[in-house]
Amino acid sequence: MLSILILAATAAGLVILLFQRLWTVLGPHHVTPRESLRLLIVAGSGGHTTEILRLVGSLSNAYSPRHYVIAESDEMSAKKIHSLEELSRAQNDSTTEYPKYHLHRIPRSREVRQSWLSSVFTTFYSMWFSFPLVLRIKPDLVLCNGPGTCVPICVSALLLGILGVKKVIIVYVESICRVETLSLSGKILRHLSDYFIVQWPTLKEKYPKSVYLGRIV
C-alpha cells in the first residue's frame, strides 16, 4: 500500500512539473529588451525563401548573429541567402557593424509529392538533426514562414523551454499565398508559436488568435 502511495505521489509530481514547464513555455511571457537577439531563420525553397528574406532584409542589425537553416539539398536558397548578406554588407558603410551570419543544413522533412505517411518518418529523421543544432545555437528568436523544414526546428525550440534550457520566442508568418486556408505547417505551428501572423483578413476571421498586420512581404 505504501509503495502504491509513493508511486502515485511521484506520478502526480511529474505531472505538475510537466504542466509548470508547459506554462512557462506556452503561457504569457514578457520580452526583455536587449542590445542584440540571436536569430534563427528557417528558409524553405522557392517562394518561401523569397518571402522570408524580404522579412530579414527589413530587420535591424540588432538581430545578430543570424543563423539560417535550410534543407541539405536546397542550393538555390543558399545562393539567395549569401547574396542578401553580401548585398547588406556592400550597402553598409565601413563604420557600421553588420550582423554575422551562419548557414546550417538539415535533412529535408518532406519532399515534393511525398506521401503524408512517409513524411512522418522523414520529419522525425530531420528532428534527430534539428534538436542538437537548436540546442547548440540557443536562439532568442525563431522566424519561419511555412516550409516543412520549420516544423522540426520549431518543435526543437519548444523543447528547449520544456526542458528548462531556454525560452525561445517562435514567430510564424504564414505565406502571402495562403488566402483562405493555412498550410500544413501553419496548421501544426499555430498551436506552438508565440506569434502566429497571417497576411489576409479572411484567415484572421477564421483564426482570431492570429496576428494580422496586412501584407508584410
UniProtKB/Swiss-Prot annotation:
It is found in: Endoplasmic reticulum membrane. GO terms for biological process: dolichol-linked oligosaccharide biosynthetic process; protein N-linked glycosylation. SUPFAM superfamilies: UDP-Glycosyltransferase/glycogen phosphorylase (SSF53756). It holds the Pfam family Alg14. Its main location: endoplasmic reticulum. The chain crosses the membrane at residues 4-26. Residues 27-217 are cytoplasmic. InterPro entries: Oligosacch_biosynth_Alg14. Keywords: Endoplasmic reticulum, Membrane, Transmembrane, Transmembrane helix. It is a single-pass membrane protein. GO terms for molecular function: protein-membrane adaptor activity. Residues 1-3 are lumenal. The keyword Methyltransferase does not apply. Part of the UDP-N-acetylglucosamine transferase complex that operates in the biosynthetic pathway of dolichol-linked oligosaccharides, the glycan precursors employed in protein asparagine (N)-glycosylation. The assembly of dolichol-linked oligosaccharides begins on the cytosolic side of the endoplasmic reticulum membrane and finishes in its lumen. The sequential addition of sugars to dolichol pyrophosphate produces dolichol-linked oligosaccharides containing fourteen sugars, including two GlcNAcs, nine mannoses and three glucoses. PANTHER family: GLYCOSYL TRANSFERASE-RELATED, UDP-N-ACETYLGLUCOSAMINE TRANSFERASE SUBUNIT ALG14 HOMOLOG. Belongs to the ALG14 family. Forms with ALG13 the active heterodimeric UDP-N-acetylglucosamine transferase complex. This is UDP-N-acetylglucosamine transferase subunit ALG14. It comes from Mus musculus (Mouse). The gene is Alg14.
